Amino acid sequence: MKVVILAGGRGTRLGELTKDIPKPMVSLLGKPLLQYQIELLVRYGFSEVILIVNHLSQPIKDHFGDGADFGIKIRYYQEEKPLGTVGGIKDLEAELTEDFLVLYGDVMMEMDLKRLVNFHNGKESQATLVVHPNDHPYDSDLVEMDEEGLIVNVLPKPHSADLIYHNMVNAAVYILSPAIFPFLEKGKKADFGKDIFPRVFTDLKMFGYNTPEYLKDMGTPDRLEHVGHDVQSGKVKRRNLENRQKAIFLDRDGVINENVDLIHKPEDFHLYPFTARAISKINTSDYLAVVTTNQSVVARNLTTIKGLGEIHKKMETELGDAGAKLDAIYYCPHHPDKGYPEENVAYKIDCDCRKPKPGMINNASRDYNIDPLQSFMIGDSEADMGAGKAAGCTTVSVMTGFGLRKAKTKPDYLFANLEEAANFIVDEPYKNLAAKVKDLASTSSKETLVINIGGNTRSGKSTLATYLQKQLKADGIDCLRITLDHWILPKSERIGKEEVFHNFQIDKLESDVQSIINGKTIELKGYTPHPDYDVEDVTYKLEGQKVILIEGVVALATENLRTISDFKIFKSISEDLLKQRMFTYYDWKGYSEESIQVLWETRKPNEYDLIAQNEQFADLVID
């Protein structure tokens, strides 16, 4: 397959950088942008490139010559005058007698070109456009596709202010067949995105190839700097779909938007105020943002696939307006229960995609080479947690929406909302601490290393303990985690002032923990953080684990607990944040605002102020 690269861009917005060279020759970490494209083509076995040049073409010719030094044959077509993205290609009609690849020479790209070619051939496409969501769709050329990827509409910029759209943008990479040429006019300046594709998508078999791989224009100094950072950090190469990807799978209702029952029209769809910030945070990371949502409203005949698409258009438009994007959306329109009036029987089936089955996660993992073991599932229901666990993901519940109430499948992590969860996953705030703990464990001469994690309620102790446990396991270090909340008395047996040591049965707790360390088996009734959860029996037994993690409010509160610890961590929290989290947590548990205020005023002097003093005993304090 021949390749045509449009390499005549002036790059006027780059100012002095393109004073003496064309835009594709702008240096990026000591190498012209165009050279990155040439090297990519060589890597995927392309053997012949035609560079369409005009403005300041000599620097390109001097650098690349005939391509021999780069392992590829390069020829040049010199335009007499600039003819946009179309004119030069029309002039090459006699040479381009088979399908050919078109690149824009001012785009930094890193993608699996073999996948692209296979997609094009598999669809028997006459024109394949590489497309992707971006963070500024409102000023980009947009396309709409059906379930098979067939392009059913092309919407060139500019767009009307009230347009509701799917965030799917022309990424300026195409595979075209000779069938395109009758629609191109010789000698006339034209643009594929603005003038040609909107006119021919009904005449040609035209498909969109959606990829999360790296494709960015470098038209401004800020974008150039951003791309340079991504190249240097390795992000550009990591996004190639030859490499295993990481994803954050997102449930929709109750996580991204307010959980109105059975949303079946756009006017009932409302994003949470924090959602765009959270998804934008994911977009800055190596994680893909992928929605997996059960939408039985189709099976119930409350809406159609097209109607569901209109709801998703609203979601994508509002996110795009805020600079956020979803890399992909997977939905299950089915429901297994039949026999209801007005149902859509075509979708009343027992499918493989409806959560808690992992079908949607598995499909996304196949489509984008995602490793579920490096990925997260964020949801608000037991079905979400079940799907995530079945696929092998780390599971995260949020307190919004259903809030995982009345669930038997517990998550790995619990956060207030999507933003809090996304910040934790992306920022990985305990990464350095985990490295320190791993070093302690691997160098300790003790048979078992005991680490205590103390701090006030809602300070993040459990989150920290879970993270450390997972990081240790990933390095092959077995860990026994002792959660001190399991010694908390049932609510009916606690004393009125919420005296912390009484409520934790401190004498029994100290004795039991010492017994566990000595190798004895301890069985407890356990503790549940939510009144809708079943209380489950807990058994603790040390069975050769290298590390014991003791985690709880009172973990540093007594001399006996401190004495058995080899490394003591205190998780601190400001009073304002503690109060905020407490109100969120007890609201999730069903308390009224008034009762939470009373609880705060009672527990602050009898627990929070008391536990805060334990910071002085820590070997390490974590904010």
Q: Which functions belong to the PLM regions below?
A:
Residues 101, 343-346, 352-385:
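Conserved Lys-Pro-Asp/Glu-containing loop-to-beta segment of HAD-superfamily phosphomonoesterases
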Residues 1-19, 243, 247-253:
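N-terminal nucleotide-binding beta1-loop-alpha1 segment
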